[in-house]
Amino acid sequence: MAILAFQKPDKVLMLEADNFFGKFEFRPLEPGYGITIGNALRRILLSSLEGFAITSIKIDGVDHEFGTIPGVIEDVTNIILNLKQVRFKHIVDDIENEKVSITVSGSEVFKAGDIGKQLTGFEILNPDLVICRLDPTASFQIELTINKGRGYVPADENRDPNADIHVIAIDSIFTPIRNVKYSIENFRVEQKTDYEKLVLEIATDGSIHPKEALKEAAKILIHHFMLFSDEKIAIETADTEGNEEFDEEVLHMRQLLKSKLADMDLSVRALNCLKAADVETLGELVKFNKNDLLKFRNFGKKSLTELDELLESLNLSFGMDITKYKLDKE
């Protein structure tokens, strides 16, 4: 049975955007879908995007985070709090973690930009952030470890049991998202005024463009929902021997091939011809060659061209071998 069409946006409107802030609009949406989509995207954006942060430090002569450094105004606890605010932008694909050793001396202020001078794979986005202040005659050696992560990770999870005893693990804020908020307004479509418009505002630390952050969050949601949309879902026992695993591409293709032709934007003539031949899904359609279709009753070249364009837009083709997608095992 065909699913009734939903009122949904043709595209996402980017009202304004720079490296630190983006404002996006989704319209029209069915009643209730504004909060459904807005809340889901907000939670994913705030908690699940990857970023880079300092995960541990080592300071010569300091054994724990409650220590002090001679000639330095801030104690180690405050230095750590400042280091947690340093924001990194990934600039070299092959480098996803980096350890850097810095000698701080001959200066009254140690800033985040001084860390950036020693880095290879990262750029510091807030170079003016003050890490600590010290006497011009004071000096100390600090080693920083930068890693890739997701969301917020406490110091206990960053602690390496094999690390040197003087290494201090710290809390890490990996998320590149500063804030996300959304609002929902009424939107009119023809004579109906109860549709919704979702406005989503995303603030980042500059390491990712808001547009890319939104795309990444949507991708994470899609990957999770893909499993639930697959009709092969079944309750499994603890014995999983013989169960087959499918990668994401196969799962996506299975779902696509099971799509009903009645839900596609096809002419009535083409749909009636296919229905008369008991061809109801994309999977059933792509099994045929073009010559086979032309043998269908009342099926002409115009309908063939229409179907050919549809399959091409979906990266499908006539005569495909779809046995590996196991559509028959439902």
Curated annotation (Swiss-Prot):
BP terms from Gene Ontology: DNA-templated transcription
Catalytic reaction(s) noted: RNA(n) + a ribonucleoside 5'-triphosphate = RNA(n+1) + diphosphate
EC top class named in words: transferase
Keyword Disulfide bond: no
UniProt xrefs under Pfam families: RNA_pol_A_bac, RNA_pol_A_CTD, RNA_pol_L
Location of the region described as Alpha C-terminal domain (alpha-CTD) in the Swiss-Prot/TrEMBL record: 253-330
GO cellular component annotations of the record: cytoplasm; DNA-directed RNA polymerase complex
Keyword Nucleotidyltransferase: yes
Keywords of the record: DNA-directed RNA polymerase, Nucleotidyltransferase, Transcription, Transferase
Gene Ontology MF: a single term: DNA-directed RNA polymerase activity
EC numbers on record: 2.7.7.6
CDD domains attached to this UniProt entry: RNAP_alpha_NTD (cd06928)
SMART domains assigned: RPOLD
Family matches, as InterPro entries: DNA-dir_RNA_pol_insert, DNA-dir_RNA_pol_RpoA/D/Rpb3, DNA-dir_RpoA, RBP11-like, RNAP_asu_C, RNApol_insert_sf
Record region (Alpha N-terminal domain (alpha-NTD)): 1-231
Summary of the function given for this chain in its UniProt record: DNA-dependent RNA polymerase catalyzes the transcription of DNA into RNA using the four ribonucleoside triphosphates as substrates.
Family as reported in the entry's similarity comment: Belongs to the RNA polymerase alpha chain family.
Subunit structure: Homodimer. The RNAP catalytic core consists of 2 alpha, 1 beta, 1 beta' and 1 omega subunit. When a sigma factor is associated with the core the holoenzyme is formed, which can initiate transcription.
Domain-related comment: The N-terminal domain is essential for RNAP assembly and basal transcription, whereas the C-terminal domain is involved in interaction with transcriptional regulators and with upstream promoter elements.
The protein, known as: DNA-directed RNA polymerase subunit alpha
Organism name: Parabacteroides distasonis (strain ATCC 8503 / DSM 20701 / CIP 104284 / JCM 5825 / NCTC 11152)
